[in-house]
């Protein structure tokens, strides 16, 4: 039997666009979509290499799912592959966010759009839970990884430990005791023939070395593209403020949008006065329900900053400027770091360190799943504090039967009827719209 051919660049483009269009619901759901597409369905990438790349991306500032797409795209087709995968992960969501920002600024909230996205969120919740179970089963082999995953979950969900400390702690534990992770972590692979990318790398031992110089050049260009608007627009009123503020955000967004949301809200609302607190919450709601990384909430803030200064045209300019200074460094980090990380793929201590991060990632995904699930299923969630501990608890009286019904529908479509991802999301969105017309 002839083995399947390595995917062409054109074929990869179609898949990266598909991932960009289907990546609703934040990083946990987006990573789940990517894993299903490139690992489960197409066998382009092995579990081991996917988790190895994810572990590195978790250490970087910026949206880890977008950086993971860039990393995998680079591995498959070099710099052009990384640029294509990373851009196609951003562009669909950015286009939707721009359109919704214009609608919001000119017309206010649109109930029909909210109903469609409500159905999508319920389906995405099912995807997140499925991804959590799948990754845990394959990544956690032995007592130590399970304990580390549980510790990471408790640190984030109960004790509000900053995300970078959780990841760095897991990295240190894995580095110090690589033997404790020998049976799992990013070295665990599913039995069967090697994935297409892994087979290609095995057949060309110098593949990474040949790709590295171009990646380094692309990384340096990415840094220049990131910094030139900051220098060029310095002192240029709102445009200089947008370039400077969001370029700072690009290097402190460890843990995704939620980790820096309070700071962004404080500065954008109280210091720059680009928008009000309710508008900030509306922007987060839009970012949660559009494809692409949640950090697109910054695009909404940039749009309103430009809109308040120069109308819709200014809003579009502010939106594009925000996107540029937010995402250009994300490409730079990957192109500069990925060749080194790939060369160290089999170094025992680095392998152990990244396996420790893999275990912590399971706890991170569990925390994101809990956060997302509570806010989808319940209309009201209370934050309870007791000494150093704090936890989100739902107001059980505010349970939303429609959300439970839509999540159940998505589970049946995915697991019982074996619907594809796109069809499941489309049916769920339509069901959410239909439910909005019922007198519930």
Identify what each model region corresponds to.
Residues 1-60, 64, 71-290, 294-440:
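Multi-pass membrane proteins that catalyze or facilitate reactions on polyprenyl-/lipid-phosphate substrates
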